[in-house]
C-alpha cells in the first residue's frame, strides 16, 4: 500500500455508482473508496482511453492499517470506523431505475459477504456480482478524483457537493435548483426555506473547504430565475 500511496491515486466511480453512494455515511464511503482504489490497480486498463477493459475479482481486502494511514486517525478509531463502514454497506442496497427490462425499480444489495480477520486487521469484502460493472467503472461516464483529496474532507454534505461538482469538471459549469439541492443533500428545514441560511451554513463553508483542500476551484451565482450556476475549474488543468 505504501507504494500505491506514492502514486497519484485516483478513484473511479461510474456516475450511476456515485448517485447510489451519495447517502452512505462517511465511514462507509471511505471503505468503498479503499475498494475502488484497488479496482484502479487490478483491472486491465487501456493506455489509449484509460477505460477499464476487464473486470477483476469481486472480493476486496480492506486493511485497518491503510485506513489509519490514509485518513490520519488512530488505530482504535480505524478499527471502529472500518467495522461500522462494512456493516453499513452490508445492510444497504443500491436502487436503480432502469429504462429497459422487466422492472422500473431494482434494489441490489451492495455486498454478498463480509468477513473479518481481527488479528491481522483485515476485512474481506465480496461485492454483489451484479454491481461489478459499476464498481469497475465500465459505463461511458465516470467521476475521477483523488482519494487523498476526498479524504481531507470531513463533512458528508461537503463530500456530496464535491462529488457533484467533480461530475461537471470537464464542462466547467453545473446548473441546478434550490429544490434539487434540498432533495439531494437532505437539507434541514431552515436551509430549505431560507436561501440566505442555505448559503451561510452550507454552500459557502462547503465551497471554502473544497477550494482549499481539493483540486477543484468552484464558485456560484444565482440567476434571475433562481437557478444556481456553479463554475468549476480544475486547478491542475486550468483552461
Curated annotation (Swiss-Prot):
Pfam families: Rep3_C (PF21205), Rep3_N (PF01051). GO terms for molecular function: DNA-directed DNA polymerase activity. InterPro entries: Initiator_Rep_WH1, WH-like_DNA-bd_sf, WH_DNA-bd_sf. Keywords: Plasmid. GO terms for biological process: DNA replication initiation. Disulfide bonds: none annotated. The keyword GTP-binding does not apply. Belongs to the initiator RepB protein family. Mutations in ORF 239 affects the incN plasmid pUC1 E.coli polA-independence but not its autonomous replication ability. This is Uncharacterized 27.6 kDa protein. It comes from Escherichia coli. The lineage of its organism: Bacteria, Pseudomonadati, Pseudomonadota, Gammaproteobacteria, Enterobacterales.
